[in-house]
Amino acid sequence: MRFPKPLFFLLACGMSLPTCASTQAPPSRVTVLYDAFGGGAGLTRDWGFAVLVEYGGKRILFDTGNNAEVFAHNVRALGIDLKNLDFVVISHRHGDHTAGLNYLLTVNPSVKIYAPKEGFGVFGAALPGTFYRSDSALPRRMRYFDGRPPVELTFGTPWPAAHFVWIDSVTEVAPGVSIIPTVSQTPGTLELRELSLALRTPDGLILIVGCSHPGIETIVEASARVANHVSLILGGLHLVTTPDAEIERIATSLHDRWHVDRIAPGHCTGEPAFAALERVFKARYLYAGLGTTIDLP
């Protein structure tokens, strides 16, 4: 029997047009919500960083910017629904990545937030009650907790109601989505814990980085625990005060030694580093200013 074309289409779709439409793959992309360059469409520039990552059907907020009001303004201007997030990743404790939590938690108070695990961290933390050296010869009044400490000591946070999950090892948090912790050895940020987001794609890993305080090469090296090849690096590389010679070395190393395919620098990468990376990566340099959307494989 031959059916009219519209009827045949409905039968092929199980008599339901919405069902057919729902078979389309969800978008895979990164949208820059917060940065100090770019903009347009009523967006407000400010020093800080935040992106929305859409990948594998997940909606992931990575960092929240420097000012809750600016973050809220940009989110609304871009039509982003923060109630519809699968989880949040906070790269590190600095205020230009965390301040927007104050707005986020008014909109989505129960969202899961992955954050670095630190002994006395701003995201809250816990240590064994015996983490300190004790002296049993002291009188009780001079001993912590009268010499009988709790099994675990928990430490406060400016966001006590938030659902923080602390990360201190490479962790797959969704299919194809991993969080990679690294530790800074740089003077000024010594021992700072930082999380980067790694997405598996057919072309290799996509690394979303906040500030790269531990060093972008250190982060790329650590990503080998997830996959051997990095297709794209997006975010802050913390070269904003780095001398030209070191910028040139790092840009060349990312391209020639680590064989990174594409780079989309933002935030604290710095203007001289933008120029150097564009020279080295040429057509594989991607602009990633405020309001930009970059499609992922």
Regions found by a protein language model. Name each.
Residues 53, 63, 75, 92, ...:
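Divalent metal-coordination and catalytic microenvironments
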Residues 1-8:
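Bacterial N-terminal signal peptides that target proteins for export
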Residues 29-78, 190-208:
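Conserved beta-strand hairpin/beta-sheet module of binuclear metal-dependent hydrolase folds
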Residues 119-195, 286-297:
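Metallo-beta-lactamase
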